[in-house]
């Protein structure tokens, strides 16, 4: 009985020092060397993460340059579009100031046009738009009774659509510019740090075990953020998390600034294009619900409505016919330029979305390192410390020859990884395999939280 008890105590003691059944003792020196090698691998992965951040920084800067070029094109297109709109409004004003001609002819046609237009529009709405037909019908009746054939004759609906489109486009660009400028100032501050402009020093410095435990600065020692956050001596224990946290906070702030505008009402209903028969029904439905002007798009389906558009008043007033031609020409130019502007605006929005996506990647690259660094509260010199190595025999529950290694990443909870039989403890890749699996396990756990 006494022999059995002594044997059990001996096994416990050897377990504490790293020895396991079926294998020779793993000495403290071996555990330290394993920790040393594993820490080198973790250090390399941190360096890779930082290099990845720098690559994303380059992409963000490239995207921003493309955005600036696109914005310049937008401003040029906006000026041309507004000039065309001004010409259209001037032609419309001149046409309205002329004494009415052909009024009797147009009024007679208008009275026959209205019932057909209403019936055609309500059939379309009931079939395609479906919701709220009763309210839309009453709204349309009022709209048609208040409209004049002259408004119809000079394409007033197209002019109104242009002006509404211009208002929405201006608002959308203002919203994007406002939020991007906020994000941009944060990004600029982030990237001005010397960490992004110089190669960082090696993050891991191997010290004799007799010296005080410490870690060197991860970022360049004279970095603005390191300098402001860590005014203490470089020989004091390093607050690793404090170096990453400002970056994460700034990235999150930039993301919030970029995300706001994509959820604003302006982006839920972007400016409409000039839709002809057979085009986007959803936009027509929205216009009908908004102010009934969408129904005027269906004028080509009613004979009497088409006749109004073809009324020729040049015999009675040649100047009116001339002004109408000028109005039609300026209207076509304004519509074409507005379509072009809308395409540029969409491209600009895609650039904004791309920047937002790159910020998400930037956050992902920094986040796992920061979360890992957040665990670093002690003065242990190792990024990865090996606490137990167990090589299993055929008597254990684990397959024979497999090695179980328990490690800690900084001050994390212990992580157990298994190393296959073909990678023995003497294999140079042994600790690289252990560290790689430990980081994978850590990242997996982090994603699941």
From Swiss-Prot:
Principal cellular location given in the protein's record: nucleus
Effect of residue 354 to Q: Decreases molecular mass of alpha chain. Decreases secretion
Annotated GO CC locations: apical dendrite; blood microparticle; cell surface; chromaffin granule; collagen-containing extracellular matrix; cytoplasm; cytosol; extracellular exosome
Protein family membership: Belongs to the clusterin family.
Expressing tissues: Detected in blood plasma, cerebrospinal fluid, milk, seminal plasma and colon mucosa. Detected in the germinal center of colon lymphoid nodules and in colon parasympathetic ganglia of the Auerbach plexus (at protein level). Ubiquitous. Detected in brain, testis, ovary, liver and pancreas, and at lower levels in kidney, heart, spleen and lung.
PANTHER family xref list: CLUSTERIN
Assembly and oligomerization: Antiparallel disulfide-linked heterodimer of an alpha chain and a beta chain. Self-associates and forms higher oligomers. Interacts with a broad range of misfolded proteins, including APP, APOC2 and LYZ. Slightly acidic pH promotes interaction with misfolded proteins. Forms high-molecular weight oligomers upon interaction with misfolded proteins. Interacts with APOA1, LRP2, CLUAP1 and PON1. Interacts with the complement membrane attack complex. Interacts (via alpha chain) with XRCC6.
Site (Cleavage): 227-228
Recorded consequence of changing residue 86 to Q: Decreases molecular mass of beta chain
Lineage: Eukaryota, Metazoa, Chordata, Craniata, Vertebrata
Protein name: Clusterin
GO terms for biological process, alphabetical: amyloid-beta clearance; cell morphogenesis; central nervous system myelin maintenance; chaperone-mediated protein complex assembly; chaperone-mediated protein folding; complement activation; complement activation, classical pathway; immune complex clearance
Effect of residue 374 to Q: Decreases molecular mass of alpha chain. Decreases secretion
Glycosylation sites noted in the Swiss-Prot or TrEMBL record: 86, 103, 145, 291, 354, 374
Effect on the protein upon substituting residue 145 to Q: Decreases molecular mass of beta chain
Location of the motif Nuclear localization signal: 78-81, 443-447
Disulfide bonds: 102-313, 113-305, 116-302, 121-295, 129-285
Protein's membrane topology: Peripheral membrane protein
PTM: Proteolytically cleaved on its way through the secretory system, probably within the Golgi lumen. Proteolytic cleavage is not necessary for its chaperone activity. All non-secreted forms are not proteolytically cleaved. Chaperone activity of uncleaved forms is dependent on a non-reducing environment. Polyubiquitinated, leading to proteasomal degradation. Under cellular stress, the intracellular level of cleaved form is reduced due to proteasomal degradation.
Gene coding for it: CLU
């Amino acid at each position: 009985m006494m022999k059995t008890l002594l044997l059990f105590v001996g096994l416990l003691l050897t377990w504490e020092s790293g020895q396991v059944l079926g294998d020779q003792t793993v000495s403290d020196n071996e555990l330290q060397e394993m920790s040393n090698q594993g820490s080198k691998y973790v250090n390399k992965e941190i360096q890779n993460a930082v290099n990845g951040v720098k690559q994303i920084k380059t992409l963000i800067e490239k995207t921003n340059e493309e955005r600036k070029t696109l914005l310049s094109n937008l401003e040029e297109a906006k000026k041309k579009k507004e000039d065309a709109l001004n010409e259209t409004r001037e032609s419309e004003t001149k046409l309205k100031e002329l004494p009415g001609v052909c009024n009797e002819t147009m009024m007679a046609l208008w009275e026959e046009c209205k019932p057909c237009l209403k019936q055609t529009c309500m059939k379309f709405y009931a079939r395609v738009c479906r919701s709220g037909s009763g309210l839309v019908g009453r709204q349309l009746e009022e709209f048609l009774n208040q409209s004049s054939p002259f408004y119809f004759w000079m394409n007033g609906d197209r002019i109104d659509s242009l002006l509404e489109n211009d208002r929405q486009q201006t608002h959308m660009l203002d919203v994007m510019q406002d939020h991007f400028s906020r994000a941009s100032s944060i990004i600029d501050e982030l990237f001005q740090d010397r960490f992004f402009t110089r190669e960082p020093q090696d993050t891991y410095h191997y010290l004799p075990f007799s010296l005080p435990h410490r870690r060197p600065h991860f970022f360049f020692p004279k970095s603005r953020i390191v300098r402001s956050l860590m005014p203490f001596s470089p020989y004091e224990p390093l607050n690793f998390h404090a170096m990453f946290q400002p970056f994460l906070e700034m990235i999150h702030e930039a993301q919030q600034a970029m995300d706001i505008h994509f959820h604003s009402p302006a982006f839920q209903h972007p400016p409409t294009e000039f839709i002809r028969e057979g085009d986007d029904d959803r936009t027509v439905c929205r216009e009908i619900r908004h102010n009934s002007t969408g129904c005027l798009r269906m004028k080509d389906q009613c004979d009497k409505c088409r006749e109004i558009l073809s009324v020729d008043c040049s015999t009675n007033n040649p100047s009116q016919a001339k002004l109408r031609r000028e109005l039609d020409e300026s209207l076509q130019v304004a519509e074409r330029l507005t379509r072009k502007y809308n395409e540029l605006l969409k491209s600009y929005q895609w650039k904004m979305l791309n920047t937002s996506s790159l910020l998400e990647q930037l956050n992902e690259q920094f986040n796992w390192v920061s979360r890992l660094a957040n665990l670093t509260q002690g003065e242990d010199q190792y990024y990865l410390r090996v606490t137990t190595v167990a090589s299993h025999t055929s008597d254990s529950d684990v397959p024979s020859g497999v090695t179980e290694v328990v490690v800690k990443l900084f001050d994390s909870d212990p992580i157990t990884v298994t190393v296959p039989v073909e990678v023995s403890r003497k294999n140079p890749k042994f600790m690289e395999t252990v560290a790689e699996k430990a980081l994978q396990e850590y990242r997996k756990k982090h994603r699941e939280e």
